[in-house]
């Protein structure tokens, strides 16, 4: 099924109707309720003891509420071309005179994805009168190794009281991740390559009075400071020559849904398709036409509720917590062949405790139209908003086999 390219104009599941008793007792969680929940002055909110940026939840709420006006002129078209939004809270930062040094762990950024936009969002308290600063961006997995990505100059003023400062770092990340080069342009200043301790020593020797170095061990930054500095990356997965396994299953169980296993599924499907064509040719030559069209049983869409808490995903999925994926139902005796194409929907269905009758689908009564759903969740230590295709059955119908 073709991938829906318009990320912003997604169709989301409507409020669950006829909610089963097992789910009625649970309190529904909405993006708005999380936004109104307890938070600290650092702009982060808690979920199961883990913190996520306010911006990510606000972005998710704007999308599902279709509030296009709340998106910036840069983010609006970018969302339509993206299927993944990753956020990286700064691991630490230091300010030495007019030099700011920001550290992020960008290990999970994949070069196989097409980078659409990278934004640096700084939401810090007022610094009084405006002054120019040089901002340097580093990638670091730990405090021992630091990789310089690029730098730029900007003016920091009291405007930070009312809003966040947003910088477009797309070219910085693109040049280094794709080309392996640091960006050197007029609006970006090349760093001198000095170690942080050298900068501190230089500032001390000059008797700078405005040096503010936050340390933990050597480079500590309080939660307040770091969590108000985030890097947001918009990307889209590149199309593959071969069909991919379900995106959810591939992320959770890469060995189970490896390329070799996927190739076997594709080959099996091709054999099945070839056998069906041969069977059709035989039937055409040997079976006389029927005078009256055969009456088929009714193929209908029925509820199939998915509760992520019950299948063990509740600790890392922020929203939605539950939804109606639906399934197709009709009287039949033969289940679907295992060589049918795997989808996110079929993967979710395999995890539900359905009876044999509920799990079985007629080969002719199948989903003929699926819709996508966006999910907000943790992926390792990163907070991700990702669009998954083929998650909900929209229409059921008969298919000839």
UniProtKB/Swiss-Prot annotation:
GO CC annotation, single: extracellular region
Tissue distribution of the protein: Expressed in the dorsal marginal region of late blastula, becoming restricted to the Spemann organizer at the early gastrula stage.
Disulfide bonds, paired cysteine numbers: 299-365, 328-396
Entry's localization field: Secreted
Signal peptide span: 1-18
SMART domains in the cross-refs: TGFB (SM00204)
UniProt record similarity statement: Belongs to the TGF-beta family.
Alphabetical list of PANTHER family matching this protein: NODAL HOMOLOG 3-C, TGF-BETA FAMILY
Positions annotated with a glycan in the UniProt record: 168, 337, 344
InterPro entries: Cystine-knot_cytokine (IPR029034), TGF-b_C (IPR001839), TGF-b_propeptide (IPR001111), TGF-beta-rel (IPR015615)
GO BP field: gastrulation
Record function comment: Exhibits mesoderm-dorsalizing activity and neural-inducing activity, but lacks mesoderm-inducing activity. Regulates the expression of specific mesodermal and neural genes. Induces convergent extension movements at the embryonic midline by activating the fgf signaling pathway to induce t/bra expression in the organizer region. Acts with wnt11 to induce Spemann organizer cells and induce axis formation. The unprocessed protein antagonizes bmp-signaling.
Entry-linked Gene3D superfamilies: Cystine-knot cytokines
Protein name: Nodal homolog 3-A
Keywords tagged on the record: Cleavage on pair of basic residues, Developmental protein, Disulfide bond, Gastrulation, Glycoprotein, Growth factor, Secreted, Signal
Positions of the propeptide segment: 19-274
The record's note on its domains: The propeptide region and the N- and C-terminal thirds of the mature protein are necessary for neural induction activity. Although cleavage doesn't appear essential for activity, residues surrounding the cleavage site are necessary for activity. The propeptide region is both necessary and sufficient for bmp-inhibitory activity.
A Pfam entry, by short name: TGF_beta
Gene, per the UniProt record: nodal3-A
Subunit relationships: Monomer. The propeptide region interacts with bmp4 in a non-covalent manner.
Chief location bin: secreted
């Amino acid at each position: 099924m073709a991938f829906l390219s318009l990320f912003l104009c997604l169709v989301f599941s409507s409020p669950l109707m006829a909610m089963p008793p097992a789910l009625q007792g649970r309190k529904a969680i909405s993006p708005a309720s999380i936004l109104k929940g307890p938070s600290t002055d650092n702009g982060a909110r808690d979920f199961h003891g883990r913190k996520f940026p306010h911006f990510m939840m606000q972005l998710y709420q704007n999308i599902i509420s279709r509030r296009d006006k709340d998106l910036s002129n840069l983010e609006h078209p970018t969302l339509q071309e993206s299927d993944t939004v990753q956020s990286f809270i700064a691991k630490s930062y230091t300010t030495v005179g007019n030099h700011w040094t920001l550290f992020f762990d960008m290990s999970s950024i994949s070069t196989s994805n097409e980078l659409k936009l990278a934004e640096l969002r700084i939401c810090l308290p007022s610094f009084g009168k405006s002054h120019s600063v040089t901002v340097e961006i580093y990638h670091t997995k730990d405090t021992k190794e630091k990789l310089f990505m690029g730098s730029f100059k900007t003016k920091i003023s009291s405007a930070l009281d009312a809003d966040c400062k947003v910088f477009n770092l797309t070219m910085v990340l693109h040049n280094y991740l794709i080309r392996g080069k640091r960006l050197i342009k007029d609006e970006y200043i090349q760093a001198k390559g000095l170690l942080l301790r050298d900068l501190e020593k230089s500032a001390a020797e000059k008797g700078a009075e405005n040096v503010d170095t936050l340390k933990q061990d050597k480079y500590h930054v309080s939660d307040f400071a770091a969590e108000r500095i985030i890097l947001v990356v918009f990307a889209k997965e590149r199309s593959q020559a071969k069909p991919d396994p379900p995106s959810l299953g591939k992320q959770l169980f890469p060995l189970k849904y490896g390329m070799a296993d996927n190739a076997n599924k594709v080959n099996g499907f091709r054999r099945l398709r070839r056998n069906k064509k041969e069977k059709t040719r035989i039937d055409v030559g040997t079976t006389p036409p029927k005078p009256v069209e055969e009456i088929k049983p009714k193929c209908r869409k029925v509820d199939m509720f998915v509760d992520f808490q019950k299948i063990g995903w509740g600790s890392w999925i922020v929203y939605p917590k539950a939804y109606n994926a639906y399934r197709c139902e009709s009287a039949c005796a033969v289940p679907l062949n295992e060589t049918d194409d795997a989808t996110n929907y079929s993967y979710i269905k395999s995890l539900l405790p359905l009876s044999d009758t509920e799990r079985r689908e007629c080969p002719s009564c199948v989903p003929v139209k699926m819709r996508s759903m966006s999910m907000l969740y943790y992926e390792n230590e990163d907070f991700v908003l990702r669009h998954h295709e083929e998650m909900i059955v929209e229409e059921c119908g008969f298919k000839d086999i």
